[in-house]
Amino acid sequence: SVACAVVCAVVFHIQLKKDIECYPTGKIRLIIREELLFFGIFLMWTYLAGFRPQAYGTEKFMDYGFMEAMMRSTTLPARDLWYSEGTINYYYGGQYFAVFLTKLTGSRVEVTYNLMRTFVAAFAFVFPFSIVRQMMKDRLYGRMEGRKKYLPSVAGVTAGVAVSIAGNVHYIVYRCVIPMIQKLKGVEETESYWFPDATRYIGYNPVNESDKTIHEFPCYSFVLGDLHAHVVNVMFVIFLVGLLYAWMKMIR
């Protein structure tokens, strides 16, 4: 972080000295606000991760083991942590990126495992915030008087919450609404609710054996502590969306 700050300061100095447009000088305040927003969301998710920081349950032990195996290895794929004669034959892109940052910062897996979780979760808030805020601002160009000037920020926060924090309504329906209806009918509750059930609604109710799938929405994976590629890839996909939007604005 310190090195990045130094590089940014040097590039900014070059911009001022040679009049090169490296940074949008009129947007420095916005950049600082978004950095503070990222830091705040990062701290929030770090606090939540602190309630269960252990690599315990579901696939977290495997995630942690993959990272340790890659930390020890000089080649890829790394040695399989369960079968030393073989190599990892499961997708490990998310764990690889976490190990890359771990080695880059000279840190240890026991530190960066949870920080990577919260790092991705924070980006999953700030990236949508920045993109949707800009989209709304472009949409309202020339019509930002009065209360409308707050709409871009409101839209940005809504987008950030939708991606990083919000989930589906499975818990509300299956843990609250349906049990309440059953209770009114005089039917006793026979099943308890397990939070991963929220990812299992396609093909499960009503049952469709030919079309069952598990939909792990971002917030579920952030709470669970998953570092699979489909989780870490969230920030890359949203970053690509931002680049595409910037490119579309440039060619119009």
Can you annotate each of these PLM segments?
Residues S210, L240-R252:
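Membrane-interface transmembrane helices that cradle and orient dolichyl/undecaprenyl
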Residues V7, V11, E68-M71, Y245-K249:
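Regular secondary-structure segments
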Residues V2-I14, F123-F127, M235-L243:
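Hydrophobic cores of alpha-helical transmembrane segments in multi-pass inner/ER membrane proteins
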Residues R29-R33, G40-F236:
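Active-site lumenal/periplasmic loops and adjacent helix-entry segments of GT-C-fold
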